Amino acid sequence: MTFTRRHFIQTSSALAGASGLGLLPAAAKPLSFRFGYSAISWGTDIEEAIKVGQRVGLPGIEPFRQNVVNYLDKPLALKKLMTDAGLQMVTCSNGGGPDFSGNFFDPAQTPKTIADHVKFARDFIKPFGYCDHFKMNNGPRPKGYEVSDDQIKVCADALNAIGMETIKMGIKLAPHPHVGSLIQTEHETRKLMELTDPRYVWLTADTSHLTLGGMDPIQIIKDYWPRLAEVHYKDAPRHLRGGKVLAVPKTGPEAGGHGWFRNLNDADGGGVDFPTLQKYLIAQNYKGWCVLDLDASMIPKGSNMEEVLKGNIKYMVDVLHVDPKTV
């Protein structure tokens, strides 16, 4: 029997009891990959984000640059806070601050973009000593919205230049297709992967953003498996499964996906086939991170991110039959 979202909602009470009694089936063997969560919704209060992660028990945390601005010159102090809480930094995403260039399509601006990203990887990510990749978004779309192949080539050249330097640090550069950004559709994603050098550029596959961009996230992961650095677990509305067109509007706050993201346990989720994805990652002996990339737009009224994380973790235990806190 297929365990659907509706079945999950209807039987959650019974499963909660079974889980508490240790009656749920365990994974056949320890997983080769680990789970983390995003710190994006805590702003600069990275200390509170760490405390929440410690309480819910996830082993990895993924901040953005804007989350760690108070630690840019003291990464080892932040590493100690994480270590003391039993956490490891998965990676740190780019972005944040007027001093940091995120333009990947204008040849006049990409030299600073390249320099800023190499410096951030060298001065902040590398000192952690164990981060093997640099997840990054690719900045805004150009004025007029449409993106040409020539502009994707400018982006690819910049990524190749950054990746050529970060790989010397033992860090794989892993761009993240993201609705509302320079790289959001299937054509743009595949063109970028075609134009980037696999020796220097990998991929962060966000299941929700790929779905909202009109892609099948499992197919994208399969097609670029040798270059997969990280997976973001985040759902989308059920009716978008199998869709082939961009789902989000071109302008406004929803252009970046806000209002379209779904938690794994949301009743109207199901745009992503997580049971099939999980089985594939296990079969392929995936050795990276899977991150619950949840943001403030996904918090129901009257709740908070800690409770949201607990709900997503419960779905993973009850439906995917894995406790992300223990792997």
Feature map (PLM): residue ranges:
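Active-site acidic/histidine proton-transfer and metal-coordination neighborhood
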Residues: S12-L21, A27, F104-L203, N304-E306, ...
